[in-house]
Amino acid sequence: MRYLVRLSVPRAGGWRAWGTTRDEFGHQLAEQESAAIVLHVDSEIRRGRDYVRVIVLATVDADDVAEALDLAWWAFRKAAGEDLAGWDLAAAEAEVRPEGH
């Protein structure tokens, strides 16, 4: 079954810090794509200069919701790589639903 996973994760350091890593993160995210998962940065929500929340959308082939979320979260963390500390993972949010619903 195909699922749409929406990950919403604040970027530590705000808009400027995100601006310096945005392209590299997008490149790393694209490298995680396979026949089972397609990901991209969908949007950025900015609140002042010290806050930005990055929205990543993933289309995932999985057996169930838990597997879809696990695959998307793994791909996000892999794309973040050594810069994982640059994300406020404790404030991350996720939404998973069957594609087309």
Where do the PLM segments sit?
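Short, extreme N-terminal segment that most often corresponds to the first beta-strand
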Residues: 1-23
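Unusually extended, aromatic-enriched hydrophobic runs near protein termini
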Residues: 1-9, 34-39, 94-101
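Short amphipathic alpha-helices in soluble, non-transmembrane regions
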Residues: 20-29, 68-76
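Short secondary-structure junctions
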Residues: 29-38, 80-87
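Short, intrinsically disordered low-complexity segments
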Residues: 34-71
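Charged interaction segments
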Residues: 57-101
